[in-house]
Every structure is written in C-alpha cells, then in structure tokens.
Amino acid sequence: MMANWVGARPLLILSVLLGYCVSIKAQEQENDEYDEEIACTQHGQMYLNRDIWKPSPCQICVCDNGAILCDKIECPEVLNCANPITPTGECCPVCPQTGGGDTSFGRGRKGQKGEPGLVPVVTGIRGRPGPAGPPGSQGPRGDRGPKGRPGPRGPQGIDGEPGVPGQPGAPGPPGHPSHPGPDGMSRPFSAQMAGLDEKSGLGSQVGLMPGSVGPVGPRGPQGLQGQQGGVGPAGPPGEPGEPGPMGPIGSRGPEGPPGKPGEDGEPGRNGNTGEVGFSGSPGARGFPGAPGLPGLKGHRGHKGLEGPKGEIGAPGAKGEAGPTGPMGAMGPLGPRGMPGERGRLGPQGAPGKRGAHGMPGKPGPMGPLGIPGSSGFPGNPGMKGEAGPTGARGPEGPQGQRGETGPPGPAGSQGLPGAVGTDGTPGAKGPTGSAGTSGPPGLAGPPGSPGPQGSTGPQGIRGQSGDPGVPGFKGEAGPKGEPGPHGIQGPIGPPGEEGKRGPRGDPGTVGPPGPMGERGAPGNRGFPGSDGLPGPKGAQGERGPVGSSGPKGGQGDPGRPGEPGLPGARGLTGNPGVQGPEGKLGPLGAPGEDGRPGPPGSIGIRGQPGSMGLPGPKGSSGDLGKPGEAGNAGVPGQRGAPGKDGEVGPSGPVGPPGLAGERGEQGPPGPTGFQGLPGPPGPPGEGGKAGDQGVPGEPGAVGPLGPRGERGNPGERGEPGITGLPGEKGMAGGHGPDGPKGNPGPTGTIGDTGPPGLQGMPGERGIAGTPGPKGDRGGIGEKGAEGTAGNDGARGLPGPLGPPGPAGPTGEKGEPGPRGLVGPPGSRGNPGSRGENGPTGAVGFAGPQGPDGQPGVKGEPGEPGQKGDAGSPGPQGLAGSPGPHGPHGVPGLKGGRGTQGPPGATGFPGSAGRVGPPGPAGAPGPAGPAGEPGKEGPPGLRGDPGSHGRVGDRGPAGPPGSPGDKGDPGEDGQPGPDGPPGPAGTTGQRGIVGMPGQRGERGMPGLPGPAGTPGKVGPTGATGDKGPPGPVGPPGSNGPVGEPGPEGPAGNDGTPGRDGAVGERGDRGDPGPAGLPGSQGAPGTPGPVGAPGDAGQRGEPGSRGPVGPPGRAGKRGLPGPQGPRGDKGDNGDRGDRGQKGHRGFTGLQGLPGPPGPNGEQGSAGIPGPFGPRGPPGPVGPSGKEGNPGPLGPIGPPGVRGSVGEAGPEGPPGEPGPPGPPGPPGHLTAALGDIMGHYDENMPDPLPEFTEDQAAPDDTNKTDPGIHVTLKSLSSQIETMRSPDGSKKHPARTCDDLKLCHPTKQSGEYWIDPNQGSAEDAIKVYCNMETGETCISANPASVPRKTWWASKSPDNKPVWYGLDMNRGSQFTYGDYQSPNTAITQMTFLRLLSKEASQNLTYICRNTVGYMDDQAKNLKKAVVLKGSNDLEIKGEGNIRFRYTVLQDTCSKRNGNVGKTIFEYRTQNVARLPIIDVGPVDIGNADQEFGLDIGPVCFM
C-alpha cells in the first residue's frame, strides 16, 4: 500500500501544479492593469513573485514582491514506529518502509487501505520581526476573535485522509473581515508539500520547478483535529471588534478528548471481484456451439535428446535483440586496439557560473499546449492508484455540447514523457497549419568539464541502421596482428564451378604393396533389361535407427481437417499476454448514483493586491457559498515583460547537428611501441579527437570455445539511456496468448447501426406452406402467342352433309375470349429440351455434408490412361545401408531461394570459447551521468552580437533528436508509380477450419493442360475506386529478402547543388571512392520496374563496411494494420437474469477436431485367406525400346500362295509372227507319258490345267517317281504350314502347336519363337490344355544345406546368386547353350500376354513365408525377377507372390517347404533368376530349392 501511495504522489503534485498554473494565467491577465511584480534573489538564484522554495531541508521561503519571507518547518513529535529515520535531504523523520525498495512503476495489485498518515504541522512563514515588547505575564484566555477575511485562494491540495469527526460545535456568529492571511497556501497544502518532500523522496523525480503562487484556491478540506487547547465555553456573541494586533503564539495546550464516532461514511466502491464459486451441478446438454477459437499454446515440452547435426539451413531472418546475457568472467587483457571512431558528443557538463543578466531575447516560438488540469471534486476520494499504461485510443465519442470558452492557460512546463501509447486510429485530416517562423539559434555555451565515469547503463535497444556515411580518408595500416590459433574446421562450402583441366602431373613414386583385399564384389552385371514397373510395397520393417535430419522439405499441401481430439489436460496458467487493443464500447449502463457537489465557481474580479501579511490564525469554517456560475472569459492581457534568466535547466535533448568544421591535416603516424603492462586506471581524461576509420583487419580464426564463466553479480542500475529513434515498423507479431480478463469497462453509448452483415448460411428448407387464398381476378392480358391444339372435344351429332363451299379468305384472328375457369392441374409434361446454359451463378455457401452413398456397381475396366503425374511419395521405406560414395557430380545450377525455415530449437549451450581477437571498435557507449556542478564563475559582460557568418558546409548528421510532435498531415501527394512486386509472403497461419461444404458431383477428370509461357507484364491499369475495407486478415510473416540488384556505375561528380529536399531512404550502396563531401543531391525519379533478372551466382562475402552515422529519424509511418486480437476482458458484473429465450435453431455440425495422437503400432494380424483371383490388370506401358538383336538367318521360302481368281478375259492380242517349224512327233503323246492316263477316277487336273486346254493323253502309263516327289513336296509344305513340334519342324509357340494340332497331348516339343533357322529351336514342355509354353530351369534344384553362416543384416534378403559362395543365378533351357534360351524367351515374351512360375523353398529352421513366432511376414523369402524386380510376400499386390503351401513357419528342426507362385501380365518380370532368404545365418539353418518351369501363355 505504501508503494502505491508513494508512486501516486508525484502525479498528484503534477495535477496540483498544473491547476495552479492555470489559475496564475487567469490572475496574470487580471493583474495586467497593476504594477509589475518584483522578483527576489537569494544565493544568486532568482525567484518570481510568490515563488515558494526550500533553501534547506527544514526551511521554507516565499518571495513577496522582492522581500523574502522564510520560516522553519516543525515536525510532529510522535511517530507510530520504533526506529524513525530521516531521509537524506528531508527535515522530518519518517517511519521506515517495510518491504523491498522497489520503486518500479510497474502495475502492482491494489493493496489494502492504509492507516491515516501523519501530517507534520508546518508553522506558517515567519513574519518580519516587530519591535520587541516587554515580556508580559501570561494573560487569561481571550475571547474568540472575529472571523478573518478569506485569504487568497491557494493551489488545490492533495486529498487528505478522512479526518476524525469532531464534536459538533455551536454555530458562531459571522465575524467581521480581518486582515488577509499570510500566504496563498492553506496550511494543509503547505504541510503536504513539506511532507511529500520529506516522506516520499520523489519530489525531485517529478523534475518540476516551483511555480509562482497561484490565485486563491478553493477551500481546503477539513483539517485534522488540532492539538490546541481544550474547548472553552462558548461566549455570548460579542459585537464585532476591531482586529487586534497579532498576539504571540501561545504554548501548546493539553491534548483534547477524542471526538465522538463520526457518521457513517458514503458507501465504498465496489470491491474486487470475488473468488470463483464452486462449480454448480451440470446443466442440460446445450446445443452444439459454433467452432471455438484455437486453443492456447501448450506448455513447452521437455528438451529432447540432441539430434544429429542437420544440414546448414538457409540464413534465418534477423532475430530480435536478445536479452542482455549474464556478465561473463573477466577476459585477459587484449592487445591494444585500433584507434576508435570519433565518439559522440558527451553529456552536457555541469552548469557554469551564473552569467550576468542578458538583454531580453526575442520572443520565442509558441510553446506546446500544456495539459489542462482537471478540477478535482472537494471531498475525500481515496488514494490514487499508480498510472496505468496508456490505453489504446478509444472510439470517437458523440459530439458534446459546445462548452463555454475558458480562459487560456499559460504554457505548462514540459511534462515527463509518458509511456509510449499504442498507435491510435488515424484521425480525420486536419487543416494544414501555416509554418511558424524559426527562432534564431542560441549562443553556444562553454563546454563543461568532463564528468566522472558513470557506471555502464543497460544495453540499449539496437537502433536502425544509419545511412552510410561519407567514406573517411584511408587510415594508416595498423600493425600486423599475431597469427591467431587455428580455427575449427568450417563447414564445406558450396561446390564451385568446374575448373579447367589441370596439367598432367608427374608420375608418383611406387607405393608399398597394400594389404590383402577382401573378397571382391560380384562382377558387373550384363546390360540392363527394360525398366520394370515399381515393385510391390516391401514388408513393414522394424523401426530403424534414428536417421540424420534431412533437409527441410517444401511446403506440403494443407492436410484435411482431422477428427476432433480428446480435450487436453488443463495447462498451467500462462503469463499475462500483451495488452490487447481496447475493447468495443459496452452497452449503456444503468444511471449511477448522484454525484458529489460540483466544484466551486470561478473567482470574482480580484482587487488590488495588498502586501503579503503574516499568517493569521486559522478561522472557523464559514458557510458554504452557493456555487457561482461560470464567468465569461477575460480579454487576454498584454504580453508581460520578459522575466530574468532562470536557473540553468536540466540537460535538454541533443540539439541538431552543428555546422561541420574544416578538416584538420592528418598528423604523421608515430612508431608502434611495444605493448606495456596495464597501468592503474587514470582519472577520466578529456575526450580525445576522433581517430579516422581504420582499415578493417582480416578476420582472425575462430578460437575454441572457452569454459562458461560463472554468473556475475548484477551490475548497478545504469542511468537511463537517451531515447532511441523509433525503430522501423516491426513485423506484425503473431497472435499472443489470450491475456487475463480486464476489468469491466464503463458502459458506452449505443453505437450506430452497423453495416449489413455478410450473407448468412442457407437455412434448411422450410416445410411447404398451405395454399394461399384465391387471388383477385387479373386484368385482361395482352394477346398471347398462338396456343397448341386443344384436346379433342366430345363427338358431336352428325350434321347433314352440306355442299362444299368455296374457300373463303383467311379471316383475321379474333380477340381472345374471357379467361375460362381454372382447369384441374394437368399431368406432368415430358421434360423440355435442354435450355441454353444460364449465366454462372454466384458461388453458393457450402451446404452440410451429405451422407455417403451406396457403393456403385463395379465398372468395366477403363482404357489404359495416359501416364499419370508422379504420385505422392509412398511411406518411408526402411533405411538402406549406406552406399559407397559416388563421384562428385557437376555443380548444379543455383537453386531458387528457399522459404525461410522455422527457427531451430535452442541447442544445448556450447562450452565457452577462448577469447577471440579484439573485435572492431564498438559503438560509442551511452553518455555518462552529468558531473557535479562547478563553482559559479564571475558573470561576464554581454558582448555585441556578431555579424552573421557564412553558412558552413553541411556537417555530418548529428545524433537523432528526440521525436518531434506529430506535424499536421500534408496534402495527399500524387500517387507514385507502382513499385516492383514484393516477394511472396510465406503462408499465413492456418485459418479456422470452414464449415464442410456439400459434396459436389464428381466432375469428369480434365487432361492436364500444358504449362503456358508466362505472359509479359501488362500495362498498369487505371486506379479503381476504393473498395470497401476488407476484413483484416491474419498477419503474414515476412517474405524472404530479395536478391540485391546489380550495381550501377558511379556517376561523374556534379557541381554541388543547393540542398534538396530530403529524399526517401534509398538502398544501401557500396562505398564509393573517397570524394570531397558534396552537398546532398536531389533524389532521382524512380526508374521503371525492370524485368526480374536471372539469379546471379552467390558473391564472395564483402568486407565489413565502416559504421555509418546514425540516420535521421524517419517520417512517421502510416498507421500499421489493426493489431492482434486483444486479451479477453474480465468478466463484467453479473447482469439480471434475462427472460427465457426462444428455442434456438439446431446448431451446425461441429468441426472435426484435430487428429488424436497416433496409437502404438499393433502387431501384424494373422494373414487372411487368399482372396479370389482378381481380374487381369490393365496392360502396362510399353517398355523402353530394346537394343536391336542380331540379324537372324534367312528364313525358308514361304508357302506358295493359293491361286488367285481368274481375271477378266483380256482383249484378243495382235496376231504374232509365224513361229519356226516344229520338230516331228506327237506333243500330246509326250504329255501323256508324263501324266499317265486320264480317267474319271483321277483327281481333277491341277488348277493350272483347265478344261479348255489340251487334256493328257490317256493311252500311256505314268512314271511313279514323279508321284512320289509330288507327294513328298506336298507333305513338306503342309508341315511348314502346320509345324508338328519336332526338332526339324519346330512350332513357334505351344499355343500355335495346339491350334494346328488340337489332338496332340501335353508333353515335350520343340519351338522356335524367333523363326528362321530351326537350328536354334529349344525344347519346352507344352501344356496342351491351356496352350502354355513352359521352359525348365537348368539345374532345376539346389540341394538343401547351410549356404550362409554369417549374420545377415536385419530383415534384409541374402541373395543366393549374388551373395552366397558357390551360388549362382538361375539359367533356363539347354545347359550347353543358355544364350539360346535367353534369346528365344525374349521373342516368346513378345508373343505372350501372361507368365507364371512356381518355386519351392525347402527349409530347416528357417522361415519361408509366415513367421509363426512374430506372426508377421517380415522374414518372408524375396524372389528376384529377370528385370531385377523384387517380388515379396507383402506390399503392392502387383509385386506380391502367392503361397500355395507353407510348412516353414516354425524353427523346430523339421524339414518343411514353402511353395511360391507368381503370375503377372508383365511378362518381362519372369523367369525368377534369384532367391533371397531373410531368416538365415545360423549354422543350423538350411535351405534348398526346387525351381519350377516358367510358363508363357
């Protein structure tokens, strides 16, 4: 409680003095007609008329028109404490404060009400000594004197504690006016002023000069019960006598009896919110609520184990300045550093001796408007709390009634800087004020002597980077440092570009013979086969060892919302969040109780001031006057004569930079001395001249980390540093956690009607309404379009047949008749033809999710689709054993800049490093505290003003001034050209999950379009009308910093122009050559936005540039975006119970909660029964084109084609020339000899001989040899057309053989799939029932024995052909010519659509498929296809074999077997060429193989 009171008192004084100043101003205006007041001087210090000051702790003085009246402060004799102490600089002892001496102004909790404080009695100011009278004997107590005239109003006092009510006295008669009182302060105020200085010690912290005596204040509160004598009997009302002379102060009377208990006080304020009551019984289940806000951030987890070293991340964003770390141990003395930069201006020295009064200066510019003080209520309000932090700007209140114009207040003294408030909402644009005239520059004061070295203040907040300074002249090279220790091996740099080929090196010497090498790896494989499809998913491996951290992956697609998780345990209470923005106005509260009486009215016109009298005795309280009405504002008086010079004030803010002096010549560098021992610290020297900027030294090697020092003692609190420049606008912070609830705010006024809200969610479809009443009959419509034919009417009676009349002219269509009665509703019409597509409707709100439909009928297998995009990565496979290092690749192109990674977790603290080489000169330290004031010097004579000097060259930028008041906003400038597009921000925080939309109909899958070429940047469109402000989105995080653009060439030096307007801050350029400092050029117009250039190679790191001077304070930025959601306010007072509301609508379906934690992995279930064979899968994509095979042998001549149909008869030819004479004999007889006799039993002549040609002669016999030849030829042709599967006539496939000879039985036959010569035919087994062609392995079995006796890696197959001694991959076909079978199988695959093969694994103590002990398939045998595809027992069904029998699941010493079968339509995967058992390696584990034939169909 005491701390609260102490913290509040300076603020109370401030309000008193401000109110005091306002009164003075009014008084001054009224007093303009009177004489000027005379100031006082004491000890060389000037005080204005009616100033009050304390020259010593126990003395108080007042200036009365040139005369100084002083008096002693009396202290109370009794203090309610054991060991009172007198603070330094105070007069009266006080009780020591209990508790820590923490005077921090942080907001503490409100304490309980304290005991009434002791108010020391201050005797009034001592009057001038009168003539000494003879000492008289003590006379009897005189009658009560007449009531004195009210003294001039003193300043409003600090509210005192409520006094003990005295006994009611009899009303006395009003006395005659007496002499005026001694001073302008009522006794309670002077006591409080004295008590404030004595008790709190904070009066000096307020930093206010005592003001002059204010006008008459309102009547002070009832004082404490005095310790004067006992109450005498009330005398009869006497005639008002003339006022007698002031008698001497009587001796103190005995202590009076305690007064009666006072009347009840006014009701106190509401107490603090009580403790939360116990939970009530659970209420009825409520309707589903709207989706909740994101929960609070969870606790920080325990620190995990140290992970392996990750890859070097992208450079992180610049972090905020960390807190000051603990002071490390004192390091060893470093070598002498380079000369430092020129230091900043030191603090202002102690004030010099008081000079003679100068001539009155010109009137200064108008001071800033002071804070108007508010009038306090009379009465006894409680103690003021500490000042809270400045709140956010509230919403604009309604326009109040126009108040009467008050008297203008005087300029207040500069108040203490308040806490920086949060940015208010932008105010309406004010009118642009006219620029004031700038005052003349003051004379420069003499430089003070350097103050003592202050203790180091806390590290200030890092300021903004300054603009680059003008490059200094190159300094002399410093002495070369000693070589530093070797640094730690740095990380491997990025690969450089490939260098040119170096010259051939000399041959080296022959090395010693190496040790015996291990068994070599298997030889190179043959040419790779065509790429197979991806293998089936491998069995679930056991959890591998922790891998090294991979590089950060790209930003993944947002996941689907998870199911709601269980509510977590209640977290610990978080720290209070940051102060949120002010909440909206609450509803109007109930009217409060009647307020206290208003303040007294304004003072009447003041009479001529009398001379200040001595303090009279305190008169009895007069009756309260009626509150006066507010007087009209007085006319402003004339400006008074300037006062005398005031005392030198405290050090002001740093002034603007002075003009630059001319550069001195550079002295010659002295020789470098040896390093001496460190001497004792000398007295603080005067500030040396600034050394030139040294050349940055080469960075020393990084030393090893030294041991961590012990935590140093906390240093003394340093002086507060100079207020830094406002930093650049920081990134918008993330949402802080919800802070504690604030107290309920005052009830606000009802706001205006808000804008219409967003479109609501579509409601559920209402029930159909009842039909409405029949409407009134409408007016007759316009003529309608021709109607459709009506229904047939009822059949009429047949009329008499009339004669056919002539066709009349078509009559005009008659008017439509009156509307008939409404017919019954017709039956539903046929659907109309499809209308044209309407305009695209606005996107509707997502409806609730419909129920899942029934599964549809299985569709026909679709056509094979185009090759899809790469699928999402599958589950992470087992970590492979590390492969050998590959050769270094060609350096890749520079990748695009990655998104900024999240900050890594804090690592374990490293051990402290050794002391590194001395760093570059640090930034100048904060200014030390001001030194003790020097002695007063003799006042000098005022010199004549000198003539105006010429304007000096522009000096370097001075230190930043304190931020100026916000200027009036200028008129809007022309909009600048569009800037280049900024980098894309990183993905913002994930928003609240939206309501689930209605399930849309499944669209047809579109083909992916080709990527278009990026269009050129279009012309900038015209500025559109300003849209309504959108809702404030969550703040995005900063995008990555763009690459720096190319450097422009340096321009020629121009002639120095006049100083232009300050341009906007440009990018930091490279330091140019050291030119003479030119005056600042005008800013160039921004160039057009160039097309983005290609990313350049990463440049070498530049050397560190010189530290530039601090830049000027930037213009005030635009108001930032709306801040994050503020903390939740405290619960308001509980309202009256409302009436029961209507039943609410059914709530929307709640959002799915976050996914619960993954459960532990269950053990693998027992394998289910094999399902039915699935339909054949789609045909896979064609394999890569194989290498062309060797040229095959020329095939046998083909079968003669059948005779074509006879063509049409041709025209008769020209008659030929006559032939030569023929030989003698019968041609027909010769034919007959050849062909034999023609009879009817013979078969028809060959088709070549038709009936119109000569028939054979039937007279001669046939030669039987020709018949045999023809039959043989016919048989050969027939076997060529339908080969019989013999070695001489091999079939192409068994399926061909079955088609040509359906009656053949299954067995071994010869086939020649590549046709051509039958020499390379192979012997196969043909299954004539299915048409399969089966090729046997050679050898077809592997004997059972222990093939592998060393431990195998966990769950990795050990290949029989690749890894095991005396093992080999399987071959097929003839053992003598295995290549023939390979070639023929290549053609056979082209002729087949399906392949299958069985393999039997004979086991003893080794698992073939199911591990009966672990109940999983992790140790199942792995098969390898001919395209190196691994075929496994689990995973993708396309790469998974089936098991026909398995008796190898137990390791019981028995021999068992597992029969594997694999069928595939990708025939390139078969035959199986290798087997990889997993469960082998022990001496008692044996296996053998029976390799079945591979069958193609």
Swiss-Prot record:
Residues 168-180, 234-246, 917-927, 1169-1179, 1209-1224 have a biased composition (Pro residues). Prolines at the third position of the tripeptide repeating unit (G-X-P) are hydroxylated in some or all of the chains. Probably 3-hydroxylated on prolines by LEPREL1. Hydroxylation on proline residues within the sequence motif, GXPG, is most likely to be 4-hydroxy as this fits the requirement for 4-hydroxylation in vertebrates. Its main location: secreted. Disulfide bonds join 1294-1326, 1334-1495, 1403-1448. Residues 1228-1497 form a propeptide. GO terms for biological process: cellular response to amino acid stimulus; collagen fibril organization; eye morphogenesis; negative regulation of endodermal cell differentiation; skeletal system development; skin development. Residues 1-26 form the signal peptide. GO terms for cellular component: collagen trimer; collagen type V trimer; collagen type XI trimer; collagen-containing extracellular matrix; extracellular space. Glycans are attached at residues 1260, 1398. Residues 103-1265 are annotated as: Disordered. Keywords: Calcium, Collagen, Disulfide bond, Extracellular matrix, Glycoprotein, Hydroxylation, Metal-binding, Repeat, Secreted, Signal. It comes from the Eukaryota. Residues 1264-1497 form the Fibrillar collagen NC1 domain. One of its GO terms (molecular function) is SMAD binding. It is found in: Secreted, Extracellular space, Extracellular matrix. Residues 550-559, 730-739, 892-901 have a biased composition (Gly residues). Residues 38-96 form the VWFC domain. Residues 155-164, 210-225, 320-338, 425-441, 602-611, 744-756, 824-839, 878-891, 1091-1112 have a biased composition (Low complexity). The keyword Metal-binding applies. Trimers of two alpha 1(V) and one alpha 2(V) chains expressed in most tissues and trimers of one alpha 1(V), one alpha 2(V), and one alpha 3(V) chains with a more limited distribution of expression. Type V collagen is a member of group I collagen (fibrillar forming collagen). It is a minor connective tissue component of nearly ubiquitous distribution. Type V collagen binds to DNA, heparan sulfate, thrombospondin, heparin, and insulin. Type V collagen is a key determinant in the assembly of tissue-specific matrices. NCBIfam families: GGGWT_bact. Belongs to the fibrillar collagen family. This is Collagen alpha-2(V) chain. It comes from Mus musculus. The lineage of its organism: Eukaryota, Metazoa, Chordata, Craniata, Vertebrata.
